[in-house]
UniProtKB/Swiss-Prot annotation:
Residues 126-139, 272-282 have a biased composition (Pro residues). The lineage of its organism: Eukaryota, Metazoa, Chordata, Craniata, Vertebrata. Residues 101-388 are annotated as: Disordered. SMART domains: LisH. Residues 315-325 have a biased composition (Gly residues). Disulfide bonds: none annotated. Residues 16-48 form the LisH domain. This is Single-stranded DNA-binding protein 3. The modification N-acetylmethionine is found at M1. One of its GO terms (molecular function) is single-stranded DNA binding. It comes from Mus musculus.
Length: 388
């Protein structure tokens, strides 16, 4: 009779009723109740052929096994007779390792009382597919906002470059800051490599400012500016946090990354943010750190402390008095004091002597006088400020 339902994994209710009726009839015959067996078949209107199994029959055998296990349960084993096999079955089941889903539920107790918690058989939270499938966050930058940048400071040379921002968009990680130079001085508008020589166009300075000298110095990543390159002629600049990047050198056709020219035109980076040809003071279209590009070179960071914004304006100690106590590594960035020794300094404008090798300490007197060496226009006013 079971052959009729081979196609279904679980027998239907009709098949279960037929099997139970067959086992009842078989049991009645094996116990000697033949009249009762025939009456049973006639009352249920059984019309199919019946094949009897071996005595005592399936129903009797099944009942004996069930009853033995039922009596050997821990709560009934002291009052009911049971076999040692049934007792061992319960003891083994209780001592077995708990299931990761059902825990220590005894075999005869089934599911615990009370409502089943949500997701009981669905694995840990979040494992179910969402009706609106979303890709996994395999790109870390996708979790950092629409204008994200790699989590690496521009002080580290060769690090990932932040994305370009447009127009008046605020910087991604520094709220409330503004660019240090207007768009007219943005060197990124005129792309090119320092080695291209005269093919680069000349940058236009902002109004009220003279030309930036015959040869803006071209420092590679990690290079330091000469000692006299920080002068008293930028009185109102509030330097924001961060590190700057070098200007391209439109007048230099050599491939040496350190070509020292007029010492008054560069406020250099302490580690460079990238290859030569990127701006020292980017406009809003450059990096998200536009207002914090030349800060760590000037503002020493105390150990364990935070930076403090201080103006580079004149003070009681002179135009750049606050710079006197600088340590050499703040002008250095990631390279040591001897990293650029021996490199040629072959710009024709190298006319002002450098009293100290790059990266060595100096006093306040060395910081004055030469910053606007090549500023030929007197229209520059000390009241012109570039505030953060």
């Amino acid at each position: 009779m079971f052959a009729k339902g081979k196609g279904s994994a679980v027998p239907s209710d009709g098949q279960a009723r037929e099997k139970l009726a067959l086992y009842v009839y078989e049991y009645l015959l094996h116990v000697g109740a033949q009249k009762s067996a025939q009456t049973f078949l006639s009352e249920i209107r059984w019309e199919k052929n019946i094949t009897l199994g071996e005595p005592p029959g399936f129903l009797h055998s099944w009942w004996c096994v069930f009853w033995d296990l039922y009596c050997a349960a821990p709560e009934r084993r002291d009052t009911c007779e049971h076999s040692s096999e049934a007792k061992a079955f319960h003891d083994y089941s209780a001592a077995a390792a708990p299931s990761p889903v059902l825990g220590n539920i005894p075999p005869n107790d089934g599911m615990p009382g009370g409502p089943i918690p949500p997701g009981f058989f669905q694995g840990p939270p979040g494992s179910q597919p969402s009706p609106h499938a979303q890709p996994p966050p395999h790109n870390p930058s996708s979790m950092m906002g629409p204008h994200s940048q790699p989590f690496m400071s521009p002080r580290y040379a060769g690090g990932p470059r932040p994305p370009i921002r447009m127009g008046n968009q605020p910087p991604g990680g520094v709220p409330g800051t503004q660019p240090l130079l207007p768009n007219s001085m943005d060197p990124t508008r005129q792309q090119g490599h320092p080695n291209m020589g005269g093919s680069m166009q000349r940058m236009n300075p902002p109004r009220g400012m003279g030309p930036m000298g015959p040869g803006p110095q071209n420092y590679g990543s990690g290079m330091r500016p000469p000692p006299n390159s920080l002068g008293p002629a930028m009185p109102g600049i509030n330097m924001g946090p961060g590190a700057g990047r070098p200007w391209p050198n439109p007048n230099s056709a050599n491939s040496i990354p350190y070509s020292s020219s007029s010492p008054g035109t560069y406020v250099g980076p302490p580690g460079g943010g990238g290859p030569p040809g990127t701006p020292i003071m980017p406009s809003p279209a450059d990096s998200t750190n536009s207002s914090d590009n030349i800060y760590t070179m000037i503002n020493p960071v105390p150990p364990g402390g935070s930076r403090s914004n201080f103006p580079m304006g004149p003070g009681s100690d002179g135009p750049m008095g606050g710079m006197g106590g600088m340590e050499p590594h703040h002008m250095n960035g990631s390279l040591g004091s001897g990293d650029i020794d021996g490199l040629p300094k072959n710009s024709p404008n190298n006319i002002s002597g450098i009293s100290n090798p790059p990266g060595t300490p100096r006093d306040d007197g060395e910081l004055g006088g030469n910053f606007l060496h090549s500023f030929q226009n007197d229209n520059y006013s000390p009241s012109m400020t570039m505030s953060v």
